[in-house]
Amino acid sequence: MPGKHQQFQDPEVGCCGKYFLFGFNIVFWVLGALFLAIGLWAWGEKGVLSNISGLTDLGGLDPVWLFVVIGGIMSVLGFAGCIGALRENTFLLKFFSVFLGLIFFLELAAGILAFVFKDWIRDQLNLFINNNVKAYRDDIDLQNLIDFAQEYWSCCGARGPNDWNLNIYFNCTDLNPSRERCGVPFSCCVRDPAEDVLNTQCGYDIRLKLELEQQGSIYTKGCVGQFEKWLQDNLIVVAGVLVAIALLQICGICLAQNLVSDIEAVKANW
């Protein structure tokens, strides 16, 4: 009987995983660069790039920070994953998987802490919103963000309309010369569907009235409570999005680690 010869196949890099990782990360890289460009453009329009100290002058949150930070992280991750997969660079692939793993565990830790320390998170959210209420007129992007949140969640202030007493333009002190004294922003007003033109003065002097008289004109519930209610009403959707993001991160880590193993196996066979 003729002898049987066992054939050994040389290890090779899996093309499917390699190009899937490359394609996914090039999209991620482009989106990150776009976010970063929008953030830098917004800062340029506000003159922040020519005066870096302006970054710390704002008392509240500058929404542009979200674009810059998220865009920067996405760009770095996308670059490492894209170039690492294309050039079969194990250093970049390991950096990608470790960085992505770190982000995943930070998200997981944040989720657990938010569940365990719900009351503390609620207090911090209340403090955060009130700090931004104080800085409402200081930055147009922050102003637009607050207006959007109050209109979307049908709320006013962190715990109620009286939180606007923290703002120098809306407080009720006798020394306040502003026409907006004892008022609230227009985004607190209950919109009349029949109105074609937005009445930006609808909140003037509204807090001089009794609370029962305010109810038909402005939202009297705070944004912290309304946000919690929104989370409860949309818990399945929010949980689904978070799980999908987590699965994508785990998939990215596994693909990168598998590609590193293939590359090292090929190198060891040289």
Curated annotation (Swiss-Prot):
Membrane topology category: Multi-pass membrane protein
A Pfam family (short name) is Tetraspanin
InterPro entries, sorted: Tetraspanin/Peripherin (IPR018499), Tetraspanin_animals (IPR000301), Tetraspanin_CS (IPR018503), Tetraspanin_EC2_sf (IPR008952)
Which Gene Ontology MF annotations are present? enzyme binding
On the Extracellular side, which residues? 41-63, 116-234
Q: Disulfide connectivity? A: C155-C223, C156-C188, C172-C182, C189-C202
A GO CC annotation given for this chain: plasma membrane
Q: Where are the transmembrane segments?
A: 20-40, 64-84, 95-115, 235-255
Q: Which family does it belong to?
A: Belongs to the tetraspanin (TM4SF) family.
Question: Partners and quaternary state?
Answer: Interacts with ADAM10; the interaction influences ADAM10 substrate specificity, endocytosis and turnover.
User: What the protein does?
Assistant: Part of TspanC8 subgroup, composed of 6 members that interact with the transmembrane metalloprotease ADAM10. This interaction is required for ADAM10 exit from the endoplasmic reticulum and for enzymatic maturation and trafficking to the cell surface as well as substrate specificity. Different TspanC8/ADAM10 complexes have distinct substrates. Seems to regulate VE-cadherin expression in endothelial cells probably through interaction with ADAM10, promoting leukocyte transmigration.
Tell me what this protein is called. Tetraspanin-17
Q: What organism is this sequence from?
A: Rattus norvegicus (Rat)
Q: What is the lineage of its organism?
A: Eukaryota, Metazoa, Chordata, Craniata, Vertebrata
